[in-house]
Regions:
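Conserved loop-alpha-helix segment in the C-terminal half of the alpha/beta-hydrolase fold
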Residues: 45-82
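Short, low-complexity, polar/charged sequence segments that are solvent-exposed and flexible
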Residues: 23-25, 64-68, 75, 95-98
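Alpha-helical elements of Rossmann-like donor-binding domains used by nucleotide-donor carbohydrate transfer enzymes
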Residues: 3, 15, 19, 64, ...
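Alpha-helix termini
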Residues: 29-35, 66-70, 106
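Catalytic active-site module of serine/aspartate enzymes centered on a nucleophile-bearing elbow/loop
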Residues: 72-106
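Alpha/beta-hydrolase
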Residues: 1-58
Length: 106
């Protein structure tokens, strides 16, 4: 926690906020329309924290992602006791899911 406090006091929270700013800009929405309807066809794995509200804010969105965006979805993993920052909150469990997924293709 002290690391984050030190970094935010040095840089502010600009890095984290810039993603949200850019995703809401009209110019970037037009650029992203180029990818509309394109599917991710490589094997994919969705990992999220079980306490991250983002996975639950739109019921059915994970199923829609599997059906329309990721045609080769191999799994959905929820990490217990993790929220939005799953890789920072539970790095070992996150790594284990990624390692297991990748080694299944070697």
């Amino acid at each position: 926690l002290s690391f984050y406090a030190q970094e935010y006091s040095r840089t502010g929270f600009q890095g984290g906020l810039n993603w949200y700013r850019s995703s809401n800009s009209h110019e970037n929405k037009q650029k992203l329309e180029l990818f509309s309807g394109i599917k991710i066809t490589v094997p994919s794995l969705y990992i999220a924290g079980k306490q991250d509200w983002g996975s639950y804010q739109r019921p059915g969105s994970l199923e829609l992602m599997e059906k329309h965006a990721c045609s080769n979805m191999k799994g959905i993993k929820f990490v217990d006791t993790a929220g939005h920052w799953v890789q920072q909150e539970q790095p070992e469990q996150t790594f284990n899911y990624i390692e297991s997924f990748l080694t299944s293709y070697i």
